[in-house]
Amino acid sequence: MKQQFICERRPKADPRNIVLGKNYRITFLTDRLVRFEYNESGAFVDEASQVIWYRDLEEVPFEIKQKNNFLEIQTKSIRIRYDERAFDESILSVKLRKPDNGCDLEWYYGKKEDRNLFGTARTLDEADGRIRLEKGILSRDGFAVLDDSKTILLTEDGWIKERKHGGEDFYLFAYGHDYRGAVKDFFRVTGRVPMLPKYALGNWWSR
């Protein structure tokens, strides 16, 4: 693809923000936005996906230690407990420390998002009346998951390719009820939504 058609992307995360094991990788994009990957083959994705283009954000300070056979990783906002095996509700949990309501909130892998505030619909094709919206990045539960495991990848030369190795690849938004902060950081990793220039809309007239 010609260079002028290739959009800017920075998909490789800062190595200082990564916790790497044999079959897992945990990447901190912010102190409240975390990427979790698990793959039995030990293969992980550094290319941009359809959704996530920018993983190279600022350094996120964190502390890591072993406690009772669990890995504990702590930023200024969250604490992760993980025992380094395939993700399961008893294997991986995250606690958000004293968000806006003053009480800790806890998420575990596979937890139902009953109070997710939903996002958008991919298309309105053949829509007739109410349509089902997809899960979004905001939730009254304080946590939301963006599953990126099956999206197409973007190559450096501007083309697309399928994921070869399977595995899990998801992003946990642990923002409590700070919805504005969650949306702001979402745009930091996805890029701004391109808007049509006014001249492309032609003349508008109403009376």
Sequence positions of predicted segments:
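Short, Gly/Pro- and small/polar-rich lid/capping loops
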Residues: K2-A13
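Short Pro/Gly-enriched beta-strand edge/turn motifs at strand-loop
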Residues: I6-E8, W53-L57, N116-T120
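A low-complexity, Ser/Thr/Gly/Pro-enriched, surface-exposed linker/loop concept
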Residues: Q4, L29-N68
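Glycine-centered tight beta-turn/hairpin loop motif at sheet-sheet or coil-to-beta transitions
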Residues: V19-N23, T75-I78
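Catalytic and substrate-binding clefts that recognize carbohydrates or anionic sugar/phosphate headgroups
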Residues: K65-R207
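Short, ordered beta-strand-loop transition motifs
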Residues: P11-A13, G21, F28-D31, E63-E72, ...
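Generic recognition of flexible, low-complexity loop/linker segments
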Residues: A13-P15, K22-Y24, R132-E134
